[in-house]
């Protein structure tokens, strides 16, 4: 890595720290190794072991994991002390392709804000990206066009609005056969091949192959209010609506958003779920997969 790249990275890390420390967040530095992780079936992890000195047999080796996120250590700190916190952490995820977007080892910024919800965090993240763009603007490796994009307010679309705009139908009104029909209409294969697919599988297919590629590239885009049919540990909201045919229905969403810049997902945020039974049930379901 050349000196310009090292200076650019150092400036980014320092600007990130300045942003959150200046707003009263406590910086954490948690371990990279953990004896247990939060169950997430979508992630492959790195496993290793600690070899105890002067021990033999079953007691000699202690299984450990490289953390895919510092969340497992951050949340106990929040629960114990009630502080807004952030961390710039090395994270490790197995089975990742290696390229300019993905890597098995990468640096993640994770922050938690007390007395705030997911919409508050949109503004915080918007301010953060604008601050970062300004902080590195004069460096040789800074991309002026990307800096101009990051300096703009987010375009905010609910997931239902995004499907209406880019796929031509209301996600809120669509059942599983409807999603299969729309996938066929949009050139994603024949309906027959989706006979065994669930609603969330078809939703993911349409999101990845139809919605995400059409998101504007000249402004950061925040997709929010994800369908509750897609499990995640976020607060749930319910809204009574009237369909085009006059029937009323309840549209359930999760207080979640993701931000895309030039088609790449940069950030993911929840209003954290607080129901202990829901959280324990989710952990059990994930661990069973």
Predicted regions: what they are:
Residues 1-120, 130, 227:
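Class II aminoacyl-tRNA synthetase-like tRNA-binding/catalytic domains
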Residues 7-15, 23, 28, 68-73, ...:
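Generic recognition of stable, solvent-exposed alpha-helical segments in well-folded globular domains
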Residues 42-45, 50-59, 124, 136-150, ...:
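Contiguous N-terminal and early-domain "leader" segments and peripheral loops that mark the onset or edge
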Residues 44, 277-289:
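Compositionally biased, low-complexity linear motifs
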Residues 77-78, 100, 234-236, 270-272:
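Short conserved micro-motifs at the rims of enzyme active sites and ligand-binding pockets
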Residues 98, 133, 278-280:
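A short, polar/proline- and glycine-enriched secondary-structure boundary/capping micro-motif
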């Amino acid at each position: 890595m050349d000196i310009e790249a090292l200076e650019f990275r150092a400036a980014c890390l320092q600007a990130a720290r300045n942003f959150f420390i200046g707003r009263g967040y406590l910086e954490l530095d948690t371990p990279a190794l953990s004896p247990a992780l939060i169950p997430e079936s979508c992630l492959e992890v790195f496993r290793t072991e600690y070899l105890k000195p002067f021990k033999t047999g079953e007691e000699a080796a202690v299984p450990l994991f490289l953390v895919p996120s510092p969340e497992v250590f951050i949340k106990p700190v929040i629960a114990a002390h009630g502080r807004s916190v952030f961390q710039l952490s090395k994270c490790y995820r197995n089975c990742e392709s290696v390229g300019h977007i993905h890597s098995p080892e990468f640096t993640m910024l994770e922050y938690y804000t007390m007395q705030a919800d997911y919409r508050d965090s949109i503004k915080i993240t918007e301010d953060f990206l604008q601050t970062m763009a300004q902080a590195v603007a004069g460096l040789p490796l800074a991309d002026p066009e990307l800096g101009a994009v990051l300096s703009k307010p987010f375009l905010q679309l609910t997931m239902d609005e995004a499907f209406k705009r880019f796929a031509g139908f209301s996600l809120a009104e669509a059942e599983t056969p409807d999603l299969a029909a729309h996938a066929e209409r949009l050139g994603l294969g024949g309906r027959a091949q989706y006979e065994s697919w669930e609603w969330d599988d078809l939703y993911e297919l349409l999101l990845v192959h139809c919605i995400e590629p059409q998101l504007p590239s000249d402004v950061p885009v925040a997709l929010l209010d994800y369908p509750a049919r897609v499990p995640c540990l976020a607060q749930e909201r319910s809204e009574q609506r009237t369909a085009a045919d006059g029937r009323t229905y309840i549209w359930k969403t999760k207080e979640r958003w993701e931000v895309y810049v030039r088609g790449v997902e940069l950030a993911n945020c929840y209003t954290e779920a607080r129901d202990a039974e829901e959280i324990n049930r989710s952990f059990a379901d994930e661990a069973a997969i």
